Swiss-Prot record:
It is an enzyme of class 7 (translocase). It is a peripheral membrane protein. It comes from the Bacteria. The keyword Translocase applies. Belongs to the SecA family. The keyword Glycoprotein does not apply. CDD domains: DEXDc_SecA, SF2_C_secA. This is Protein translocase subunit SecA 2.
Length: 788
């Protein structure tokens, strides 16, 4: 098996695999010796390893013996012994790379090895799973091994309170879902005191199903939002107006990027209906925003694909998993636009208070690794964004699943009829069948075709998510037919029922190519686990969503030269090349979009780091607030100077009255010097005129240094002003990001344009925060009457 895997690897990875084999041999050589130790002697190894690390040894120095200790502990506690290939997987993870292991190869047991070794450093290890159920399961299972060896294991899930979270993070190893770790990071950076924070500095994380977390959810921001009111009447009115709009006449929609915009005719129609002269005028900004969100809600979001309506509420659906995203809502009025589209009650609009993408959250970990059954197709992205290699791990038993060649039909109707025939054929043999679909809508379409032939099945999609684990658990029973969204039940094994092995195992049917080969491979991988028999077959049509979105023109050309049989099956061989090529184009498009979004997100990520660093400094009780305020005075004076002493204007044209009033707001001085074109000809002149005044004022501020009550008051006020300005900044950045793609003037790069304008917005935000702090101090000192 190792030799067959080596053939698929590059020279670098072949060398690594050879190195891993040598290390595995060293681990195996220790097995007999460790098996002779008592439980107490084995447990004491943890103390020995910690002492070695404290004395200057490294993780590399202890890993061989540490892995052997974990293997021995697992044998005693769980009755499970790590296979050699699982040891290889553990070594890959320890080095901060991705172990590609087919489902059913025991990834959970593999994770026990590197988590133990890195936990010995005493800085905490996070194990990321895709849902709460798996986090609890893995913590309870593998946690027994680590606790046997003297380590503390914690669980971080949304349902626990902050005090429990703090304990979970103080544990040596903490299990949980990635989004909750991210939300805790955001909450910690909104805390009013250090005592409210629960996390400690990041150290090492292992992500299960890493492709799902870092690729599929890469663009998904984690958002903590407050509520702000929105106009229900205007949302309903805009939804009604949009329903009368015609594609290409009033708006354009790009299915590939899912972006929509109004045409000139569309703009004119809006202006006529609302009786306004210019939709782009500042006074009509709210109307334009509501209209563009109404347009997006109608053309870019499809019911039972992107969302479902349940109990008079819009519930968003994860397009990759088919699961409802509990607690998630769209921001910036888009969720309300969907509610108006469906005629539901309009909820309050969300205003972002803190946000970070999954990508940038996990990039904060100094060391990161992961496991999945399918990552090789995304290796380039993992390497470029996270500096991680994807290393295929040999299977313990050979994979004998038969992956049949795709069949392609002209129409969707012909495809679904062929799916039905395939279901009847394999069901007659008694084999269990799993039918993978792209969306809720498609799963219900397949169900209708099976209903027509009175075929009994179980349907698993976002509308039946509560039964997911039970439905997947029975999907391998004799004669069972299950229709499911492609990723449903991921992390739960489909075990073959009695007698199914002899019939040929589970048969998987794909009803459409996904926009990534990786997800297709995941569906195939539901069959043939751990050396079981199984098969897979994809049924496609030229009306499939991916082909229509990315190759509509090519389809029209292709259909002229195709040969088909009486069922609509395409016999022309080149159709397979066409499908494969289109899927690669689609993957490239998504990669480019993620890369582009990451470039934009890196800008706000840098800004976030500046704000959060300052915020954490403010939370420190020993931070001297006066030392923070003094530089702000100079910055505020400089900002006011730039605002009123406009470059390119004559001094006689400068507004000295407003300049003086603004300075009086931030400086509590008895005798503000007279400012005019007579004594101020440049910003440098202003600094010179104010030099003595500023010096005396700073002395007064410095006298407040010993006032401990004021220090505490300044701390709370600074946190309030900083948080409020950051919320407004995030709002401004959202609008900037939405509009930047439409503003590619001449040859200007939208990324550079975004970076430039984002910097301007950030400088304004930070400057406004500093001015507000200076005003507060001035009010505390009391502005003398003669300068009012």
């Amino acid at each position: 098996m190792l030799n067959s895997v080596k053939k698929l690897l590059g020279d670098s990875q072949k060398r690594k695999l050879k190195k891993y084999e040598q290390l595995v041999q060293e681990i195996n050589n220790l097995e007999e010796k460790l098996s002779d130790l008592s439980d107490e002697e084995l447990r004491h190894k943890t103390i020995t390893f910690k002492d070695m690390l404290r004395d200057g040894k490294t993780v590399d120095d202890i890993k061989v013996e540490a892995f052997a200790v974990v293997r021995e502990a697992a044998k005693r506690v769980l009755g499970l012994r790590h296979y050699d290939v699982q040891l290889i997987g553990g070594l890959v993870l320890l080095e901060g790379n991705i172990a590609e292991m087919p489902t059913g190869e025991g990834k959970t047991l593999v994770s026990s090895l590197p988590t133990y070794v890195r936990a010995l450093e005493g800085k905490g290890v996070h194990v990321i799973t895709v849902n709460d159920y798996l986090a609890k399961r893995d913590k309870e299972l593998i946690g027994q091994v680590h606790e046997f060896l003297g380590l503390k294991v914690g669980l971080n899930i949304p349902q626990i309170d902050p005090s429990e979270k703090k304990l979970a993070y103080e544990a040596d190893i903490t299990y949980g879902i990635g989004t909750e770790f991210g939300f805790d990071y955001l909450r910690d950076n909104m805390a009013a005191s250090k005592n409210e924070q629960v996390q400690r500095p990041y150290h090492f994380a292992i992500i299960d199903e890493i492709d799902s977390v870092l690729i599929d959810e890469a663009k998904t921001p984690l958002i903590i939002a407050g509520k702000k009111s929105s106009s229900s009447d205007l949302h309903y009115l805009c939804a009604k107006v949009i329903k009368s709009f015609q594609d290409t006449l009033h708006y354009t929609y790009d299915a590939e990027s899912k972006s929509a915009s109004f045409t000139e005719d569309g703009i004119t129609k809006i202006e006529d209906l609302f009786d306004i002269d210019n939709l782009y005028d500042l006074e009509h900004q709210t109307l334009y925003h509501y209209m563009i969100q109404a347009l997006r809600a109608h053309v870019a979001f499809q019911c039972d694909v992107d969302y479902i309506v349940h109990d008079e509420k819009i519930l968003l659906v994860d397009i990759f998993t088919g699961r409802v995203m509990d607690g998630r809502s769209l921001s910036d009025g888009l969720h309300q636009a969907l509610e108006a589209k469906e005629g539901l009650e309009i909820t309050e609009e969300n205003q972002t208070q803190a946000s970070i993408t999954i990508q940038n959250f996990f990039r904060m970990y100094p060391a990161l690794s992961g496991m999945t059954g399918t990552a090789k197709t995304e290796e380039k992205e993992f390497n470029r964004v996270y500096n991680m290699e994807v290393i295929p791990i040999p299977t313990n038993r050979p994979i004998i699943r038969e992956d049949k060649k795709d069949v392609v039909y002209v129409t969707a109707d012909a495809k679904y009829k062929a799916v039905r025939e395939d279901v009847l054929k394999h069901n007659k043999q008694g084999r269990p069948i799993l039918i993978g679909t792209m969306s809720i809508l498609q799963s219900e379409t397949v169900a209708r075709y099976l209903d027509e032939a009175n075929i009994t099945y179980q349907l698993l999609n976002a509308k039946s998510a509560e039964q997911e684990a039970d439905l997947i658990a029975t999907a391998g029973q004799k004669g069972q037919i299950t229709i499911a969204t492609n990723m449903a039940g991921r992390g739960t094994d489909i075990l073959l029922g009695e007698g199914v092995h002899e019939l040929g195992g589970l048969h998987v049917i794909g009803t459409e190519r996904h926009e990534s080969r990786r997800v297709d491979n995941q569906l195939k991988g539901r069959a043939g686990r751990q050396g079981d028999p199984g098969s897979s077959q994809f049924f496609l049509s030229l009306e499939d969503e991916m082909l229509k979105r990315f190759a509509q023109e090519e389809i029209e050309k292709l259909t002229k030269s195709l040969k088909t049989d009486e069922t609509g099956l395409i016999l022309t061989a080149k159709v397979h090349d066409f499908v494969n090529r289109t899927q690669l184009i689609c993957e490239g498009s998504h990669f480019s979009m993620r890369e582009y979004n990451l470039k934009l997100d890196d800008v706000i990520n840098d800004q976030r780091n500046v704000i959060y660093k300052l915020r954490n400094n403010l939370l420190q009780e020993d931070t001297n607030m006066i030392e923070i305020i003094i530089p702000m005075i100079d910055h505020a004076v400089e900002a006011i100077s730039k605002q009123y002493l406009v470059e390119g204007m004559l001094p006689e044209e400068w507004d000295f009255a407003s300049l003086t009033a603004s300075l009086n707001e931030i400086l509590s001085v008895e005798n503000m010097p007279s400012l005019s074109a007579n004594n101020v000809h440049s910003p440098e002149d202003l600094q010179s005129v104010l030099k003595e005044t500023l010096s005396l004022y700073k002395e007064r501020v410095n006298e407040l240094d010993s006032n401990t009550d004021l220090q505490q008051s300044l701390r709370y006020v600074a946190l309030h002003f900083l948080d409020q300005n950051w919320v407004n900044h995030l709002d401004a950045m959202t609008h900037l990001k939405e509009g930047i793609g439409l503003r590619q003037y001449q040859q200007e790069d939208p990324t550079r344009l975004y970076q430039k304008e984002a910097l301007d917005i950030f400088l304004y935000t930070y400057g406004n925060f500093e001015k507000e702090m200076c005003r507060y101090v001035a009010r505390h000192l009391g502005v003398p009457e003669n300068v009012q």
